[in-house]
Amino acid sequence: MSRVKAGVVGVGKMGEYHVGVLAELQKVDLAGIVESNEKRGKSIAQRYEVPIFTDYRELFGKVDVVSIAVPTAQHYAVAMDFLNSGIHVLLEKPCTNNLKDAQELFKVAEKKNLTLHIGHVERFNGAVQELFKIVTEPIFVECTRMSPFTDRIKGDGVVLDVMIHDIDIVLNLIKSKVVKTNVLSSTVFSERDDLVVAQLQFENNCIANILASRASQNKVRTLEVTQKDSYVVLDYTDQEIYIHRQSSSEHQLSKGALRYKQESLIERIFVHKDNPLKLELQHFIDCVKNGSPRKVAVDSELYSLQIALDILDQIKKQKK
């Protein structure tokens, strides 16, 4: 396979990002896009000079790979049709809205020797890649992901929309099974979960606190890790990572007053600022063309979804 023919199904905000990156990748030909919104589809097609279709089945026989960025409720049916047609699939997160459908998709992909990649783009953030080199024995992990409300995502609440990014990173960072989950949630601007705090306790005694909100007036995306010998702070947006280490501390008696003095060392880690989506699509294409191994195992993909769904189940039970 000298050149890869690619298509994109669903060119909303995320889908358009895929179109833009695929159009620039070497040895990739953008063969077509699919969009049900005629006005939106024509606009993207003209901008990138690519054929447009209204039925995704029209891409069968025209593409080797496809990026699917449709609403989550449509993921299973659309992805399954492409896999059954022998086409490699990059499916935007979350994989599906239930575990059984996700398992079936991976089984079909394996049976047909096809690549099924789930779009967890934060894995390809340069700061996250450095984080996995630094963190070895986490004690406590705290994630904060806040942004203003937008009606861009109408089908999913904040758990499947954005919290799943942090769930995925946390599980792969801690590398232990979740034994207990506590969840608090609130609906603010929609009928679904707009603000969720999930506390996860792991088999190895590590604890994670994950906050996801689309009810904030500012945008914050950070992850902090406490280890015995360091405190690591990661900023997803700026792609920066800092390591704090305590160098000394002492109590001082001055004029009858007891004062505490602490000195810390702060190390800023060099992080490449490459486009995470570009790196993700390059990895996907490499898996397809060269048979390169996936960076994340199927079991890990499914476990991230399982924990996200467990959190949603707790939210539903609390509302009854």
Predicted features, each with a name:
Residues 65-68, 203, 283-320:
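C-terminal helix-rich "cap/oligomerization" subdomain common to oxidoreductases
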Residues 18, 48-106:
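Beta-loop-alpha module in the N-terminal Rossmann-like domain of NAD(P)-dependent dehydrogenases
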